[in-house]
A protein has these predicted regions:
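Expand to "…catalyze enediolate/carbanion chemistry for C-C bond making/breaking, isomerization
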Residues: 1-264
Length: 264
């Protein structure tokens, strides 16, 4: 197989006219589970290494299973683990989400690890990425900075205050808003309230800042209904709830349906 593109994910999310992408969110560290969820009409799959329990080996295999199912895989790394970001791109990830990017310095360090010169100092070694995509070494090197994405999480008061400066960093492609952590931060720890009208005001302001900088906006939605609201708000990429939530909701629904039929 000879390829000409990583997978088209970066072009689509950057285009601004994708219609809004919906991604699975997986913390359960089972590559086969990735393959199963990727059969659904998700536009992508996110593996969560920050709060999920993926390690490097399982994440690399999860990326492979996502690609086998025809879906791009984005990975959220642990806080500050930029070396892991480079390794995951080598394994074939289409993008990296970095949590707790609170300053220009954080954003530059992240971009430095995920982009080849002149944008950064990513080290060479994308063997699995080339296997997955069919790209030659020369083509991968020439296109990787454009066709993989670096996404900074905005989830603290410091990050919100520095959002324009963070968005201005070369090599940073977009932001991912963590509304749960941001709601905790903005209330000084008083409440977890990611889906309130007050939070919507902040989200809309961040979308506007992304548009001003020519970058894309991503966000976590707690469920499908909320994901739809966020797409309508103007986000380019949304999560429609986490794997554990969807798994348990499906099981609970099946049990409830069976008991209802039994009692009728």
């Amino acid at each position: 197989m000879v390829g000409s593109t990583v997978d088209g994910f970066a072009e689509r999310i950057r285009s601004g006219n994708s219609g809004g992408m919906i991604s699975a969110w997986i913390g359960i560290p089972d590559p086969l589970f990735v393959n199963h969820l990727a059969q659904e009409a998700f536009d992508a799959v996110v593996l969560d290494m920050q709060h999920g329990v993926w390690d490097m080996t399982s994440a690399a295999n999860g990326i492979g299973q996502g690609r086998l199912a025809g879906k791009p895989v984005v990975v959220r790394i642990p806080v500050g683990d930029f070396a892991m970001a480079s390794r995951l791109l080598d394994a074939g990830a289409s993008g990296i989400i970095a949590p707790m990017i609170n300053s220009v310095s954080d954003a530059r360090g992240f971009a430095n690890a995920t982009k080849y010169p002149p944008l950064g100092e990513r080290s060479w070694g994308p063997t699995l990425a080339m296997n997955h995509t069919g790209l030659s070494a020369a083509t991968y090197l020439a296109t990787a900075n454009i066709e993989t994405v670096a996404i900074a999480m905005i989830e603290t008061r410091a990050a919100l205050d520095a959002a324009d400066d963070i968005l201005a960093v070369d090599g940073l492609d977009g932001i991912f808003i963590g509304p749960s952590d941001l709601s905790i931060a903005l209330s000084d720890g008083a409440r977890l309230a990611p889906d309130t009208p007050e939070m919507d005001v902040v989200l809309k302001q961040l979308i506007e800042r992304c548009r001003a900088h020519g970058k894309f906006a991503c966000v976590f939605g707690s469920n499908g209904v909320r994901a739809g609201e966020l797409l309508r708000m103007g986000f380019d990429f949304v999560i429609a709830g986490a794997d554990t939530q969807q798994l348990r909701a499906g099981a609970a629904g099946a049990i409830a349906a069976a008991r209802k039929v039994q009692s009728d």
